[in-house]
Amino acid sequence: MASKKAGGSTKNGRDSQSKRLGVKRFGGEKVLPGTIIVRQRGTKFHLGNNVKMGRDYTIYSVVEGLVKFERFSKERFKVSVYPKAV
């Protein structure tokens, strides 16, 4: 017969893994085509020039250039990539 009392179970101890969302390339940074600029859930940032959106709302560059975040209403931003002037 066991002489050790059974330990109680806990209802805590679960958490989801972080999804590493957020801005990956900031304003003024140089990017290449295909570079991820923002990972997000929903459209926290909207599309500007020379960027596209993936099916998970990831915004990425389609040209080589510099990233620019532009405010287009009181609390909304759009992300653009402008080619460097030659």
UniProtKB/Swiss-Prot annotation:
GO terms for molecular function: structural constituent of ribosome. One of its GO terms (biological process) is translation. Transmembrane segments: none annotated. Disulfide bonds: none annotated. Signal peptide: none annotated. The keyword Ribosomal protein applies. InterPro entries: Ribosomal_bL27, Ribosomal_bL27_CS. One of its GO terms (cellular component) is ribosome. Keywords: Ribonucleoprotein, Ribosomal protein. Residues 1-26 are annotated as: Disordered. The keyword Lipoprotein does not apply. Belongs to the bacterial ribosomal protein bL27 family. This is Large ribosomal subunit protein bL27. It comes from Bdellovibrio bacteriovorus (strain ATCC 15356 / DSM 50701 / NCIMB 9529 / HD100). The lineage of its organism: Bacteria, Pseudomonadati, Bdellovibrionota, Bdellovibrionia, Bdellovibrionales.
